[in-house]
Amino acid sequence: MTCNNIFPISILRSGIKPLLSNDHILSFYKKFSSALISRMWKFKRAKNSRYEDSDFLRVFFFSELLGRSIHDTSELLNAYLLSKKRGRRKIFSDGRRKREIPHQTEVNKYLRKIGLQKARNILRECLDKQLLEALDNGLISSKVNVLIDFTEHPYYGRRDDRLIKGTNRQKGTKKMRHYLGFSLLSRDTHLYAGLRQVATGQSKIPIIIKFLDHLLDLGFELKYVLMDREFYRAELLDEIKGMGGDAIIPAKNYKTIKRFVKEYLEGKRGRVSSYTFSSAVEARCRFIAHVNLIIKAKRGFSLRGVKRKYQQGEITLKEARHRVFTIMTTQKPRGKESSWASRTSLFYRRRWMIETGFSDLNRINRRWKSNHDGVRYLDMLARMLLYNSWKMNKKRLQTPHKKGMSSPNWTLNQNQDFLRVTFLSDYEKLHGVVG
């Protein structure tokens, strides 16, 4: 890959430039830099050091934009800037040539100074800034839906501590890093809002409650909280209801749930049932959650069809149960019960947006192999900022178009290309590069 290839195919003729102001294109990067540099004050640089903190961060962030390693990015940027500069390149007495960009080893050494707790605080501060910017610009509303899910990153090293957990779902290893992700969905815009690495034996419920409290402190209101069945806790549903939100979560096939499904198939019960479940009897603090259970047919089947075939004896009870699923919500039925049940169960499908979002994060760059948890956190933060930038710019481009008019299909690759152009343009001005 030559140094000229860091410039993507020009997209400036597409009419996009006037709609995306430079003020907010790279505002997330500026916030990231200031948040990180402000926490590096105790690490004194050598008097003869020719690089500033921002130089190391530019290499790191541009590596995420390029989707390349720190080494490749450092060499590409260095070759590109030197090709644009006039004059001879200085050669030191030991044969080394003067660089314009810090080397990979220096960048990695700088990033490793950032511990796990600092990285968590930086992630929290940067994502908060981006969410509030989206709110101020009208891209999302103050009433948001929260999506919660886990993601796993395989680990191939020799560490054996609480932050490295066991798994049987990864190829070539039985170890992983376990991350709990949070995202917001509002006005059809999906933005990442938080991330937390979960240790072995650590309860996820306090982490979720703390995050939701933080959202309320930022000025947001909860509408729905969409979760998978692994978050099936009465305590959590009770807390969400107390915060003014409603939870939607798949129901586990306990005896009571199976009985409700059987009674519905036999015509003794409706598709919506009131259900009360609680935490274990031996728990220190017992919580009780009152929910509404919704029975819904799986894709390719109709609820009436499954019920009719069961009553006519065409399928067994076991087959009928495999064709339906149950979800529960703390929200009370509104309007016509059957319509409300269909709307609620269909809306739950949007929980998959956080899982497809994790796939998009992996498209931005390959996963780092760094053994430092703080560096891995910064890598995930950079990807989330770039993902949110894509979603926010896509929403900005859709806003000027009237209803009925086709809006530009702004893809992740287009957004990455546009950010590279803007990033390099600012970088050239900073280094005094002659066009």
Regions found by a protein language model. Give the residues of each.
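A short, flexible helix-boundary coil/loop motif
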Residues: 7-17, 39, 264-304, 363, ...
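Basic, short loop/linker segments at the boundary and entry of helix-turn-helix/winged-helix-like folds
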Residues: 12-62
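Short, solvent-exposed helix-loop connector elements
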Residues: 41-48, 338-347, 360-380, 397-401
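Short, positively charged, Gly/Tyr-enriched micro-motifs
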Residues: 47-124, 186, 223, 240, ...
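Short, conserved catalytic/metal-binding motifs centered on acidic residues
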Residues: 59, 73-74, 103, 107, ...
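Active-site-proximal, Lys/Arg-enriched surface segment
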Residues: 108-185
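Electropositive, glycine- and tryptophan-enriched low-complexity nucleic-acid-binding patches
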Residues: 168-221, 321
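An anionic, glycine-rich sequence signature occurring as long contiguous blocks
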Residues: 243-354, 361
